[in-house]
Amino acid sequence: MQLNSTEISDLIKQRIGKFEAVSEARNEGTIVSVSDGIVRINGLAECMQGEMIELPNGGFAMALNLERDSVGAVVMGPFRDLREGQKVKSTGRILEVPVGKGLLGRVVNTLGAPIDGKGPIENDGYSPIEVIAPGVIDRKSVDQPVQTGWKSIDSMVPIGRGQRELIIGDRQVGKTAIAIDAIINQKHTGLFSIYVAIGQKASTIANVVNKLEEHGALENTIVVVASASETAALQYLAPYAGCSMGEYFRDRGEDALIVYDDLSKQAVAYRQISLLLKRPPGREAYPGDVFYLHSRLLERASRVSAAYVEAFTKGAVKGKTGSLTALPIIETQGGDVSAFVPTNVISITDGQIFLTTELFNSGIRPAVDPGISVSRVGGSAQCKVIKKLAGGIRTALAQYRELAAFAQFASDLDETTRKQLDHGKKVTELMKQKQYAPMSVAEQALSLFSAEKGYLTDVDVEKVLDFESSLISYAKTEHAEFYAQLNETGDYSKEIEGQFHAILETFKATQTW
């Protein structure tokens, strides 16, 4: 076959004309050291703070230290197979996690991957874990309650939607129990819940998940897990990941509750990372920005205006406010609330529920200390009936504590003092409550009314809780319509007060306990 030079040249020209050169600009670097989950990289000239860096083993690292000649990054997973001299690539992206209603009822890790064996998750998209909190103009005042189901908290330390309420105390005093019951109580209120477990034993987390499932609350809850066996990086990032999942609901005009259990362990993980990155240590060896670590997280919990929701959803949702309520947990050592991290978080939050070992060991559970527990914004969100009836409870307990201390040294007490002591004992007994038994508004109102209006005067201290239980059962069966209405409205009026009196008088006249 004879080749025609003209045909060949035309063919070559056609091929050249069709050829498209694809150029890919990539920012590459070289690992210069690997130790304790920290990689130092040379050559990443255009790296951002918090940027994800692709590693040769398929994993990712997050850039945290941007130095003159190198980048210090923390590895998000296994790092044993990383070696000096290996190439890494910038991604130009910061860490994102899946968000959406598809995560409800699921247990996920910090990166949003399912770890419950129930298959893949159908998410509605992805959200960055670091988001700037809504500004002052975008916020709305807190005026709707979050009913925790704990009568001592809902009456004395009320929590509102969009509030940050710290739960603080030593180990093993019931901090997690309060948070879990608050989540269980939301299964009929329309609040979605996110439980973030940081640095806990896997067996403890499994128990919490089982309890949520057992009480029907898991289907409205997302559980984010960074257990004690996870790397410090994942424990440090878990609260931010959980917060982004909660913001999905807030920004679409819904209400969500997030529990961080606990932020002490997150601070320890961040301290570990900072020391490995050779950042200068400060008080208690924490880095200088440990306050910002928690403030930028907790400021994201807020109640946002309808205008903010409408703008975010581009008009799809109108006339609805959204909220994200945070219950951070802090563990103290020997009751020392003046330590570095506890004082930081106390100053950031809108109040604290302080649990003491002394109350817990004396059988008063939940072990809430009403003297130093406070809610700075929740009072305006409290429902009317609880607000009206709870006024005398804190006063009665404060007077009882003072008189009980005085009575130890006084041999002869007058009648008024004896009555106050007796009333204080009964109110203290009434504030006791079992775990996994959250109380509705109507149940709490009946209980508080009986104490406030003197219906416990002739009841022995040992029988106070039996009296309460029998009273609630009686009201549920004999006055079901009033009971349901009170649960729905939470109102208080002269007519409702009269109905309360009628229920209690009939109950005391006809029932035994």
Swiss-Prot record:
Residues noted as binding ATP in the record, renumbered to the chain: 169-176
Protein location: Cell inner membrane
Pfam short name (any one): ATP-synt_ab_C
GO terms assigned for molecular function: ADP binding; ATP binding; proton-transporting ATP synthase activity, rotational mechanism
Site keyed Required for activity: positions: 373
Major localization class: membrane
Membrane topology note: Peripheral membrane protein
Record note on quaternary structure: F-type ATPases have 2 components, CF(1) - the catalytic core - and CF(0) - the membrane proton channel. CF(1) has five subunits: alpha(3), beta(3), gamma(1), delta(1), epsilon(1). CF(0) has three main subunits: a(1), b(2) and c(9-12). The alpha and beta chains form an alternating ring which encloses part of the gamma chain. CF(1) is attached to CF(0) by a central stalk formed by the gamma and epsilon chains, while a peripheral stalk is formed by the delta and b chains.
Protein purpose: Produces ATP from ADP in the presence of a proton gradient across the membrane. The alpha chain is a regulatory subunit.
PANTHER family, per the entry: ATP SYNTHASE SUBUNIT ALPHA, MITOCHONDRIAL
Family designation: Belongs to the ATPase alpha/beta chains family.
Protein name: ATP synthase subunit alpha 2
Organism: Psychromonas ingrahamii (strain DSM 17664 / CCUG 51855 / 37)
Taxonomic lineage from the root: Bacteria, Pseudomonadati, Pseudomonadota, Gammaproteobacteria, Alteromonadales
Gene: atpA2
